[in-house]
Amino acid sequence: MWMAKRLIGFCMLCIVCQPLLAQRKVRLADLPPFERVVVCVKYFEGLHGREHYPYVGYGHRLLPGENFTINMTERQADALLRADLMKRFEYFKGYGKDALLLTLLSYNVGVGRLLGYGKHPKSRLLQKIEAGDRNFYKEYVSFCRYEGKILQGLVRRRQVEFALFYLP
């Protein structure tokens, strides 16, 4: 059942991203893995405008002392996204083939939600990966709540991300 969902999610992403990549005549599958992560984030986040403040670019949350403007160009937003993803990748590069999947998830939910902080323990997802358990689809897709409610858009996003970046 979950394999069918993965396949459907992957097909949805390929169909939706086709127009984005058609401008350069590049297939999603032909891109290097990090570039696929960038395309995936750009698709799901979109370029944020004034109504999404304090988020700018492709979902970057402004931190104290940062002075990025809401009126970023697409090129500036792309550079900021790549810098953010590389910073997050540094946290997870020790996780081998799951590093990109964890990087992508942490861009949306935060590094602290995965690694744990303060009184919050490490996520069950990381615990399973560290234990060598490769059956963590349920734990990955469980990061689909906003203010306690399950959002179907986030469920679909997690399914597509898992289909694209999970390596058995």
Describe the function of each predicted region:
Residues 99-113:
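Short N-proximal segments of mature Sec-exported proteins
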Residues 18-22:
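Sec/Tat signal peptide C-region and signal peptidase I cleavage site
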Residues 49-53, 91-101, 139:
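Surface-exposed patches in mature extracellular/periplasmic domains of secreted proteins
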Residues 11, 23-48, 60-65, 72-91, ...:
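Long, amphipathic alpha-helical surface segments
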Residues 9-17:
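Bacterial N-terminal signal peptides
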Residues 1-8:
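Bacterial N-terminal signal peptides that target proteins for export
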Residues 53-56, 60:
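Early exported N-terminus immediately downstream of N-terminal targeting peptides
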